[in-house]
Amino acid sequence: MAGPIREKIRLVSSAGTGHFYTTTKNKRLHPEKMETKKYDPVVRKHVAYKEAKIK
């Protein structure tokens, strides 16, 4: 049986606070890196979050 299609990813804050969210995405349908605006509680603002690998 094949492995899971959805892979776990980490969304890291571009504000440099070290805050991150974890989520999953379908690598086959969306091979590009994910980028979205989310709330960063450290700076108390919405900032861009970029995809990074989970170590």
UniProtKB/Swiss-Prot annotation:
User: What PROSITE patterns does UniProt report for this protein, alphabetically?
Assistant: RIBOSOMAL_L33
* GO cellular component annotations of the record: cytosolic large ribosomal subunit
| Family annotation (Pfam families) | Ribosomal_L33
Q: Which cysteines are joined by disulfide bonds?
A: none
Q: Does the keyword Ribosomal protein apply?
A: yes
**The keyword Ribonucleoprotein belongs to this UniProt entry's keyword annotation:** yes
Where would you find the membrane-spanning parts of this chain? none
What domain of life?
A: Bacteria
Q: What UniProt keywords apply to this chain's record, in alphabetical order?
A: Ribonucleoprotein, Ribosomal protein
Which Gene Ontology BP terms does the record give? translation
Q: Which InterPro entries match?
A: Ribosomal_bL33, Ribosomal_bL33_CS, Ribosomal_bL33_sf, Ribosomal_zn-bd
> What GO annotations for molecular function exist for this entry?
structural constituent of ribosome
Q: Which residues form the signal peptide?
A: none
Classification via HAMAP family: Ribosomal_bL33 (MF_00294)
What is the similarity comment for this entry? Belongs to the bacterial ribosomal protein bL33 family.
Q: What is this protein called?
A: Large ribosomal subunit protein bL33
